[in-house]
Curated annotation (Swiss-Prot):
Record's GO cellular component terms: ribonucleoprotein complex; ribosome
GO molecular function: structural constituent of ribosome
Family from the record: Belongs to the eukaryotic ribosomal protein eL34 family.
Organism: Saccharolobus islandicus (strain M.14.25 / Kamchatka #1)
Name listed for the protein in its UniProt record: Large ribosomal subunit protein eL34
């Protein structure tokens, strides 16, 4: 049985075939998915994905309205639509 730290599902399991023919399990951190815009689903620029605890709040996402939620082009469309109403 693996040690308790490796039983967590926050680590991904990679099954590796050894030269002897046996299968070993290697553990590594999961990679986070790229954040996407809520409207157009394009990848967001300027948003970090992994190890967010290492960064300050301003480094994790853009400092603008809806930063980290909408891309800049969708935000421009939204602002124009709100102004025109």
């Amino acid at each position: 049985m693996p040690r308790p730290a490796l039983r967590s599902r926050s680590l991904r399991r990679i099954y590796v075939k050894l030269p002897s023919g046996k299968t070993a399990i290697h553990y590594e951190r999961k990679k986070n998915d790229i954040p996407k815009c809520a409207m157009c689903k394009k990848p967001l620029h300027g948003v970090k994905t992994n190890f967010l605890h290492k960064y300050g709040k301003s480094e994790k996402r853009p400092e603008r309205p809806f930063g980290g939620y909408l891309c800049s082009s969708c935000l421009a469309q939204l602002i124009k639509a709100m102004v025109r109403q």
